[in-house]
Amino acid sequence: MAPASLLDLVSALPATESWGPAVSDETMLDGVPFAPYSKGDKLGRMADWTEGKDRERGGRQQYGNRNYRDQQVYGANQQTNPFAIQAAEEEATFSVVDNTRTSTRTRGFGRGGGTVFGRGRGQRGGQAQRGGRGTFQRVGGRGGQQYDSRGGRGGGRGGRRFGWRDDKPQRNRDASVQVKPEWTVMEEIDFSRLGKLNLDTGDGEDLENYGFLYYYDRSYDKQPGAKTSERRLNVLERAAYNVTTSSDPILQELSDKDEATVFATDNVLSMLMCATKSVYSWDLVFSRKGNKVFIDKRDGSNLDMVTVNENAADAPLEISEGNKDSINSPGALMLEATHINNVFPLQVVSESDTNKVNMTHEHPFYNEEVETDPPASKAYRYRRFDLSLEKDDEPLHLIVRTELDAVVKNNINGEDQYLTIKALNEFDNKAQGSGGALDWRSKLASQRGAVLATEMKNNSCKLARWAVQSILAKADTMKLGFVSRTNPKNNNDHVILGVLTNKPRDFASQMALNLNNGWGIVRTIVDMVLRMDEGKYVLVKDPNKSLLRLYQVPLHTFEEEDVEDMQAPNEEDEE
């Protein structure tokens, strides 16, 4: 018998049977095999011969398909689908967590990455673009983390669950100024855009010097934190001034001489340069007169107040928010810190005619015929900075009035070094809002680095402003005092625990403070005002968002309030 050929064997097979999975009409489209596919799904296996439709995974009950979800099902991966449309009302609470390792190096502000100002090279970048919601953060420690937006099961060692317990209601703070109906919003700038700005500016030049300074008492530098170094904080009556830009006669003279385009004080300029670090609401007044811009603060503005633990994770609560200690509320702590910073620099200097250094000109604000108290040790440096770019047709200069608090002899060369003097205050390290602060009395001597690091975390905006003010004034040294309550329950009596000495630029580097970013913010806001019509504008930091709003306001805004405040006492006297 002749052997059968392969063709005969194949033709003898039943026509109804075939190798492989059974052909179903549900997976056919016009006679072509078809599998539903969503562009949001991850590509997986082409065929799975081990998993059946009714097969349980690893012997584990599915419980309504809660713990097991087939990732090959059409549209099963919609949570990570970049093409999915998110509801607008869910954007405020939406969060994405990524487990990929992120590099510590930041991308330069080049093409498509915000505005970069560079003298000599022009403006390398384009306009700042509003980013999307795709900012990923590495959360939790080592171990497995759950990346389901609903929380999921807890991670491994060092991990934690992210669920509804993390959705704490945001505090609703009040704005620093009441926005009137007649105010018009001109610009809105979020902090993410401000953080990309950069302008390289020099050290500036001195124009005028006014006032006088006393020598610093070096005895306050001995053994910070030691029991023998504690001194009671005394209240001294001295005449001090905080004159705003438009009311400064020296700045007015410099404006008349066309010495610069922008005029400000170190108080308002430091707030603008450190805007991205702020949490509380604040406001600045911009007045454009011709081609000149004056940056002012309102009378009674919170810029005159010193905040306490503004940047703490659990900042001090208001009385209305359940704080039972009225002396530890934000408003009371601001008053206490402001008082301490007013009297502390007066106590740590040696007041005598032999320990006095006079500046080129006399005090610009003190009037002996009117004042009964002697003037405080204070020197005013009027300094000019160049904010120009290569593309500018005309140079853009800024003049700022800076302040110095004392002077000290250099131990090596005997030259005078100028100081700024500030003070941190401790209220109660066990109270709500302390931000995990250490006990200064027991830790300042042995762990002063940890104490200072905690203060940098809880008061980053305040300390950044102090560092900026010292750099603007070209101070050689910044003295930082540590003042604590004599009794945590009494906010009237205080004791000086010690004083630490820092170089302003070194201190700024420790805080990762980018001065070029601050100058970029100033230049950007000034450019906005110069592009608008002459008039008055108010820049307000949103009380509950990382956002700045620039309003155009009537020319007599805030002036009418001052007139009403002056008339009110007269009416009461007549009654």
Curated annotation (Swiss-Prot):
Q: Which InterPro entries match?
A: eIF3d (IPR007783)
For region Disordered, the annotated ranges are 36-66, 103-177
Q: Where is this region: RNA gate?
A: 302-316
Q: Biased-composition ranges for Gly residues?
A: 109-144
Q: Which GO terms describe its cellular component?
A: cytosol; eukaryotic 43S preinitiation complex; eukaryotic 48S preinitiation complex; eukaryotic translation initiation factor 3 complex; eukaryotic translation initiation factor 3 complex, eIF3e; eukaryotic translation initiation factor 3 complex, eIF3m
One GO biological-process annotation of the entry reads: formation of cytoplasmic translation initiation complex
Q: Where in the cell is it found?
A: Cytoplasm
The UniProt entry lists the main location of this chain as cytoplasm
Q: Which GO terms describe its molecular function?
A: mRNA cap binding; translation initiation factor activity
Q: Which UniProt keywords apply?
A: Cytoplasm, Initiation factor, Protein biosynthesis, RNA-binding
Similarity annotation: Belongs to the eIF-3 subunit D family.
Q: How does it assemble?
A: Component of the eukaryotic translation initiation factor 3 (eIF-3) complex.
UniProt note: domains: The RNA gate region regulates mRNA cap recognition to prevent promiscuous mRNA-binding before assembly of eif3d into the full eukaryotic translation initiation factor 3 (eIF-3) complex.
Query: What this chain does, per the record?
Result: mRNA cap-binding component of the eukaryotic translation initiation factor 3 (eIF-3) complex, which is involved in protein synthesis of a specialized repertoire of mRNAs and, together with other initiation factors, stimulates binding of mRNA and methionyl-tRNAi to the 40S ribosome. The eIF-3 complex specifically targets and initiates translation of a subset of mRNAs involved in cell proliferation. In the eIF-3 complex, eif3d specifically recognizes and binds the 7-methylguanosine cap of a subset of mRNAs.
The record, for PANTHER family, names: EUKARYOTIC TRANSLATION INITIATION FACTOR 3 SUBUNIT 7, EUKARYOTIC TRANSLATION INITIATION FACTOR 3 SUBUNIT D
Q: Cross-referenced HAMAP family, in alphabetical order?
A: eIF3d
Query: What is this protein's record name?
Result: Eukaryotic translation initiation factor 3 subunit D
User: What organism is listed for this UniProt entry?
Assistant: Phaeosphaeria nodorum (strain SN15 / ATCC MYA-4574 / FGSC 10173)
